[in-house]
Swiss-Prot record:
Gene name of this polypeptide: DDX6
Residues bound to ATP: A140, K141, N142, G143, T144, G145, K146, S147
Consequence the record notes for mutating R373Q: In IDDILF; decreased P-body assembly; decreased interaction with LSM14A; decreased interaction with LSM14B; decreased interaction with EIF4ENIF1/4E-T; decreased interaction with PATL1
EC number, UniProt record: 3.6.4.13
Protein name in the entry: Probable ATP-dependent RNA helicase DDX6
Chain residue ranges for the region called Gyf binding: 286-316
Disease connection: Intellectual developmental disorder with impaired language and dysmorphic facies: An autosomal dominant disorder characterized by intellectual disability, developmental delay, impaired language development, and dysmorphic features including telecanthus, epicanthus, arched eyebrows and low-set ears. Additional features include feeding difficulties, mild cardiac or genitourinary defects, and distal skeletal anomalies. A chromosomal aberration involving DDX6 may be a cause of hematopoietic tumors such as B-cell lymphomas. Translocation t(11;14)(q23;q32).
Domain Helicase C-terminal per the UniProt entry, residue ranges: 308-468
């Protein structure tokens, strides 16, 4: 029976007959991306939000045992090395090391335990400038380490002796807020006192008000909720020294721009503003001219699409789409896939069809209750299902590195939407596949998007070379490696 898991997370047809269902997917971590998460961590975030990093007592005792001169790196619990092939999107660096930035040892410990070995290009450009206190306007591709680029200097500049809010990260979606806050918590876990709070719409406002009675150093929020808390006098932002706008193009679109203007007006005049996005339309330029002071501009966008993502299209009629999808499922070696539809109704209908075909499937869209969205997001991220059907809710910043295939079941109308959709695969320089089901009515949009993005979307071949999107890799425990 294919009932939508909206009462229990949205899961469709987990059956042993499904050819893709070969046990849980192993999530992987990458610099600036998400890393692995457990449901226990999700519950901790959901129930406490203001977090004294659950592990900090352990972390403090750990840091106190390290004496000057000790090789502190030997105490680290490093994840297995990710030996997958990476593209120049993340490997084309200047050769810097995280130690070159004179970061606190406790912060370095968190960085290395995330599996972040060396800074990516956006991190190399961003970290030293952000540490100097200068405003930044940064363009970088999706999935190249933007989160680490701003979280590392943000955490380094915290004064843990003070008990006020010192930094804010504003993101456009609730799922992205939870993801960024979890990364922040993990990176800062050895800092012994860094308190991170995630606050988003769709959660209990009273709980957030109570949490703000305690010490909070970093707030990661969606725009409407944090403005509400500021106006109520609960979130006191008169000591905020840094504000980050992640996915700035979305935050400064018509939906949010007035809210963002109102938030900025509540902050101290000498605050530092960091803007990060893959695209910067006119609205971002206008905001920059009004609020940023001599910003340092970073542009790592020689081309818009990720080098590791191969793009194909298949011409179909509307009635042929499900059959074509079934063929793709049977022929592709999918680790995890994200399938995009253009409406919530079509998401649910397609998820039901996929279930009937015998494949495991979650679905998620903006009309679902927040707690159900949270469960679907974290269950999919933890590899409990191979396929996720969704709307464009899932296009912004979401980092699930096990995803190697993105399918546009419904082709988008805007180049910006297309860019963010296909950026869900090929994360952090890895390989991925984007397949577009194109109807007669989509043909002009296809041509237009190719021209706007300066990319080539090829006709799908009868056989797709697995080396384009399947990462055959082996992870070995770090302690087994020889110097």
């Amino acid at each position: 029976m294919s009932t939508a898991r909206t009462e229990n997370p949205v899961i469709m047809g987990l059956s042993s007959q499904n050819g893709q269902l070969r046990g849980p997917v192993k999530p992987t971590g990458g610099p600036g991306g998400g890393g692995t998460q457990t449901q226990q961590q999700m519950n901790q975030l959901k129930n406490t939000n203001t977090i004294n990093n659950g592990t900090q007592q352990q972390a403090q005792s750990m840091t106190t045992t390290i004496k000057p001169g000790d090789d502190w790196k030997k105490t680290l619990k490093l994840p297995p090395k990710d030996l997958r092939i990476k593209t120049s999107d993340v490997t084309s660096t200047k050769g810097n090391e995280f130690e070159d930035y004179c970061l606190k040892r406790e912060l370095l410990m968190g960085i290395f335990e995330m599996g972040w070995e060396k800074p990516s290009p956006i991190q190399e450009e961003s970290i030293p400038i952000a540490l100097s206190g200068r405003d930044i306007l940064a363009r970088a591709k999706n999935g190249t380490g933007k989160s680490g680029a701003y979280l590392i200097p943000l955490l380094e500049r915290l004064d843990l002796k003070k008990d006020n809010i010192q930094a804010m990260v504003i993101v456009p979606t609730r799922e992205l807020a939870l993801q960024v806050s979890q990364i922040c918590i993990q990176v800062s876990k050895h800092m012994g006192g860094a308190k991170v709070m995630a606050t988003t719409g769709g959660t209990n406002l009273r709980d957030d008000i109570m949490r703000l009675d305690d010490t909070v150093h970093v707030v990661i929020a969606t725009p409407g909720r944090i403005l509400d808390l500021i106006k109520k006098g609960v979130a006191k932002v008169d000591h905020v020294q840094m504000i980050v706008l992640d996915e700035a193009d979305k935050l400064l679109s018509q939906d949010f721009v007035q809210i963002m203007e109102d938030i900025i007006l509540t902050l101290p005049k000498n605050r530092q503003i960091l803007l990060y996005s893959a695209t910067f339309p006119l609205s971002v330029q206008k905001f920059m001219n009004s609020h940023l002071q001599k910003p340092y501009e970073i542009n790592l966008m020689e081309e818009l699409t990720l080098k590791g993502v191969t793009q194909y299209y298949a011409y179909v009629t509307e009635r042929q789409k499900v059959h074509c999808l079934n063929t793709l499922f049977s022929r592709l070696q999918i680790n995890q896939s994200i399938i995009f539809c253009n409406s919530s109704q079509r998401v649910e209908l397609l998820a039901k069809k996929i279930s009937q075909l015998g494949y495991s499937c979650f679905y998620i869209h903006a009309k679902m209750r927040q707690e159900h969205r949270n469960r679907v997001f974290h269950d999919f991220r933890n590899g409990l299902c191979r396929n996720l059907v969704c709307t464009d809710l899932f296009t912004r910043g979401i980092d699930i590195q096990a995803v190697n295939v993105v399918i546009n079941f419904d082709f988008p109308k805007l180049a910006e939407t297309y860019l963010h959709r296909i950026g869900r695969s090929g994360r952090f320089g890895h390989l991925g596949l984007a397949i577009n089901l194109i109807t007669y009515d989509d043909r002009f949009n296809l041509k237009s998007i190719e021209e706007q993005l300066g990319t080539e979307i090829k006709p799908i071949p009868s056989n797709i070379d697995k080396s384009l999107y399947v990462a055959e890799y082996h992870s070995e425990p770090v302690e087994d490696e020889k110097p």
